[in-house]
Regions:
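Residues at alpha-helix termini
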Residues: 18, 91, 262-263
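His-Asp-centered catalytic microenvironments across diverse enzyme cores
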Residues: 2-19, 44-47, 102-254
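Active-site neighborhood of thiol-dependent amide/isopeptide-bond enzymes
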Residues: 54-121
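Extended, charged low-complexity segments
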Residues: 234-299
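A broad, structural surface signal
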Residues: 13, 36, 40, 80-91, ...
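Secondary-structure boundary elements
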Residues: 6-73
Length: 299
């Protein structure tokens, strides 16, 4: 659907409003400065979250549904967030490409070929002849776009790194998250173009398989200039880098949903009391099992 006021889709203005911007016409021509502002706003205001997967009713990942989620005050995981943001940037005139990526828990779990990259939808944007890594769906990583150049990239208190992977292919790269972070190790991606449809089967597996981390554990993330905030099961962490990290255990469903609303800017009014209680029971048990496992390993 296209707005009568201009040639932008009708969803573009309310999407931008969610990010704190006026209508598309007010942004002017695509620029690196505007891209940075849009990216920062997205990771600050639109959370990475898996509430629906945890409730056993995963949503689709097509662009229209992903955008509708954001307009309804929700977030999603990479397939939702990067799919929606890529669509927004495209209608705003940016040169956007979708790529296949793979999140690694460690180097040992990295795939041997780019054909095996299926678990992450990565984006790049070319501006003024330079390609940038754009990612609003990689948990507690990018706060703003990162130039696709080999080396270390500092964003606020966090240190990221990009390296080419010639052993995989001429278009393969590895993004390393901050060494002090524990949520994931790295993300490999290939610059070969992809489409959102390439991730359908991976989404089905990641959103329904009992072995999927998104089915096993509750996850909630946001970034801003000075910190990363996240909830893993019932533990709420604020990480300000350089060892400045505080974690507390949430005590109730009410506290979880208050944090999700007040800190992560989510509208969860569609989740009723029964589902909230069932979800909290699941999250609390998973958190207790995780702590018991790690306490046992340390003894």
């Amino acid at each position: 659907m296209t707005s009568k006021a201009n040639d932008h889709p009708a969803w573009a203005a309310p999407y931008l409003a969610k990010l704190g911007f006026d209508d598309p016409e007010s942004l002017g021509a695509p620029s690196l400065d505007t891209l940075r502002r849009l990216h920062r706003a997205h990771v600050e205001l639109i959370a990475f979250e898996n509430f629906d997967i945890q409730l056993g009713r995963p949503q689709g990942i097509d662009p229209a549904e992903s955008i509708a989620r954001i307009l309804a005050g929700r977030g999603g995981y990479c397939f939702n967030l990067n799919n929606a943001f890529g669509e927004l940037l495209t209608v705003l005139g940016y040169d956007v490409t979708v790529h296949r990526g793979q999140v690694n828990g460690s180097v040992a779990t990295a795939k041997a070929t780019a054909d095996e990259y299926t678990t992450h939808m990565a984006l790049t944007v070319v501006i003024d002849g330079e390609r940038w890594s754009v990612d609003v769906g990689l948990a507690n990583s990018h706060h703003e776009p990162i130039p696709l150049r080999e080396g270390v990239h500092i964003q606020g208190p966090f240190r990221f790194e990009l390296r080419p992977l010639p052993e995989i292919g001429p278009d393969a790269w590895r993004f390393f998250t901050d060494p002090a972070q524990t949520t994931f190790h790295s993300m490999d991606f290939t610059l070969a173009p992809a489409t959102w449809e390439d991730f359908r089967s991976s989404h089905t597996e990641l959103s329904t398989s009992p072995q999927s981390p998104f089915v096993r554990w509750f996850e909630l993330f946001r970034r801003d200039a000075g910190c990363a905030e996240f909830v893993l099961d019932d533990e709420f962490t604020r990480d300000e880098g350089a060892g400045r990290r505080t974690t507390r255990i949430l005590e109730s469903a009410q506290e979880l949903f208050k944090v999700a609303t007040d800190v992560f800017h989510l509208d969860l009014s569609a989740i009723d009391d029964a589902d909230r209680a069932a979800l909290w029971d699941r999250i609390q048990r998973a958190g207790a099992e995780w702590r018991a496992k790690h306490e046992s390993a340390e003894n």
